[in-house]
UniProtKB/Swiss-Prot annotation:
It is found in: Cell inner membrane. This is NADH-quinone oxidoreductase subunit D. The gene is nuoD. One of its GO terms (cellular component) is plasma membrane. The keyword Translocase applies. GO terms for molecular function: NAD binding; NADH:ubiquinone reductase (non-electrogenic) activity; quinone binding. Its main location: membrane. It comes from the Bacteria. It holds the Pfam family Complex1_49kDa.
Length: 396
C-alpha cells in the first residue's frame, strides 16, 4: 500500500457522550486506536457570567458563583466574598468563619464524591455512583437546611453568612461525620485494590511536576505530581491556620494517584468538619454570623420593626447595595478542583467594575491534548474523569 493512502481518522467525542462530563466536545485524531491529537471545543455552556456581574450589585453577584462549579457551589461564593471583604477592609466574625469553612469542606466532599464515583463509572464500575449519590443527598440536605436551597445556596454574604445554623443541624452534621468514613472505606475496598480499576488508571495520563507548573495546574493535579501545594496551608485564609489536617500527595502523577488523593482528601475534610463543629460549640464559638455594620449587612428583622434607621438601611442595601472603595484585588481559595481565583476591580460604586474569574478546570482541560497523546481511545474518558472538569466554570 502506498504511504499516501494512510491517513488518520478524526472523530467527535461528545457533546452528548456520557463520559464527556457535560457539554464537552473533543475532536480526536486517531491512528488506529492510538490518540494522535485532542482538540477540546469549549463554550457550549458560556453564559457571559463575568459581563453580567458588572451590571449587578455585590449582593446580586453572589448567586452567579453558585452556577460556576455547580457541584460544590459555596466554595466559589467564598472567593468572591473574600475579595469584596479585602477591598472593604472588614473582619469576618469568628463564628461566620467557622461556618464558612464547615460548608466549604462539605462542598469538597460533594465534589470529590461525584468525581471519584463517576471516574469509576467511566471505566466500567456501576456500583460506586449509587453509593456516592446516597451520601451526596445527605450533604445537599445540610445545604438546604442552612440556606433553603439544595444546590444554588447563595448562603455566603460579604461580611459573613446569611443566617446562623440551628443547633440540631450542627448535631446532624456531626453524626454524619461519624458515619461517613465507613462509606469511604467501602468505596476503598471496591476500587483501590480492584485489578480492573488499576489497569485502567495506573500509568495513564501521567503529568510530571514540571509540566504541572508549566500548564498552570493547581489542586489535586499538582498534588498528584508530588507537590504539597494547598492554599489552605500555604496561604491560609479564614480560620484554616488553626485547624489540623494533612495534605496527601502522589508520586507518579497518574490517574490512579489523583483518585487516591481525592479519597484521602475526603477523610481530611471530615477531620476539618469535626474540628469546626467542636469550635462552634466552644464558649468562644458563639457570637454574630456577620459584621455588625448596617452599611454592609442588613439589620435584623426585630431591629427593623423598632428603628426607622434600620428600616432605611435595609431598604438602601436591597435597592442600591453598598459601595466598595476603589481598588483591585486578587483572592484565591482552594476549591475542590484547584485554585479558584477572583480578580475584583472596584471603581468606588455599588457594582463591580470588573470581575475576572480564574477557573482551575480551564487550565486542566487545555492540557488534555498533551496528556492524552499516545494513549488509547478508551483511556481518554479515564483521563477526562481524573481531571475533574465541570463546564459551568470552564465556559463561565
Amino acid at each position: 500500500m502506498p504511504e499516501g493512502a494512510l491517513r488518520n481518522f478524526t472523530i467527535n467525542f461528545g457533546p452528548q457522550h456520557p463520559a464527556a462530563h457535560g457539554v464537552l466536545r473533543l475532536v480526536l485524531e486517531l491512528d488506529g486506536e492510538i490518540v494522535e491529537r485532542v482538540d477540546p471545543h469549549i463554550g457550549l455552556l458560556h453564559r457571559g457570567t463575568e459581563k453580567l456581574i458588572e451590571a449587578k450589585t455585590y449582593l446580586q453577584a453572589i448567586p452567579y458563583f453558585d452556577r460556576l462549579d455547580y457541584v460544590a457551589p459555596m466554595n466559589q461564593e467564598h472567593a468572591f466574598c473574600l475579595a469584596a471583604e479585602k477591598l472593604l477592609d472588614i473582619a469576618v466574625p469568628r463564628r461566620a468563619q467557622l461556618i464558612r469553612v464547615l460548608y466549604c469542606e462539605i462542598g469538597r466532599i460533594l465534589s470529590h464524591l461525584l468525581n471519584v464515583t463517576t471516574q469509576a463509572m467511566d471505566v466500567g464500575a456501576l456500583t460506586p455512583p449509587l453509593w456516592g449519590f446516597e451520601e451526596r443527598e445527605k450533604l445537599m440536605m445540610f445545604y438546604e437546611r442552612a440556606s433553603g436551597s439544595r444546590m444554588h445556596a447563595a448562603y455566603f454574604r460579604v461580611g459573613g453568612v446569611h443566617q446562623d445554623l440551628p443547633p440540631k443541624l450542627v448535631d446532624d452534621i456531626e453524626a454524619w461525620c461519624v458515619a461517613f468514613p465507613q462509606v469511604i472505606d467501602d468505596l476503598d475496598r471496591l476500587l483501590t485494590g480492584n485489578r480492573i480499576f488499576k489497569q485502567r488508571n495506573v500509568d495513564i495520563g501521567v503529568v510530571t511536576l514540571a509540566q504541572a507548573w508549566e500548564w498552570g495546574f493547581s489542586g489535586v493535579m499538582v498534588r498528584g505530581s508530588g507537590a504539597a501545594w494547598d492554599l489552605r496551608k500555604s496561604q491560609p485564609y479564614e480560620c484554616y491556620a488553626e485547624l489540623e489536617f494533612d495534605i496527601p500527595i502522589g508520586k507518579n502523577g497518574d490517574c490512579y494517584d489523583r483518585y487516591c488523593i481525592r479519597m484521602e482528601e475526603m477523610r481530611q475534610s471530615v477531620r476539618i468538619m469535626q474540628q469546626c463543629i467542636a469550635k462552634l460549640r466552644a464558649p468562644d464559638g458563639g457570637g454574630p454570623v456577620a459584621v455588625q455594620d448596617n452599611k454592609i449587612f442588613p439589620p435584623r428583622r426585630g431591629e427593623m420593626k423598632r428603628s426607622m434607621e434600620s428600616l432605611i438601611h435595609h431598604f438602601k442595601l436591597y435597592t442600591e447595595g453598598f459601595r466598595v472603595p476603589a481598588g483591585e484585588v486578587y483572592v484565591a481559595v482552594e476549591a475542590p478542583k484547584g485554585e479558584f481565583g477572583v480578580f475584583l476591580v472596584s471603581d468606588g460604586s455599588n457594582k463591580p467594575y470588573k470581575c475576572k474569574i480564574r477557573a482551575p478546570g480551564f487550565a486542566h482541560l487545555q492540557a488534555m491534548d498533551f496528556i492524552s497523546r499516545g494513549h488509547l481511545l478508551a483511556d481518554v474518558s479515564a483521563i477526562l474523569g481524573s481531571l475533574d472538569i465541570v463546564f459551568g466554570e470552564v465556559d463561565r
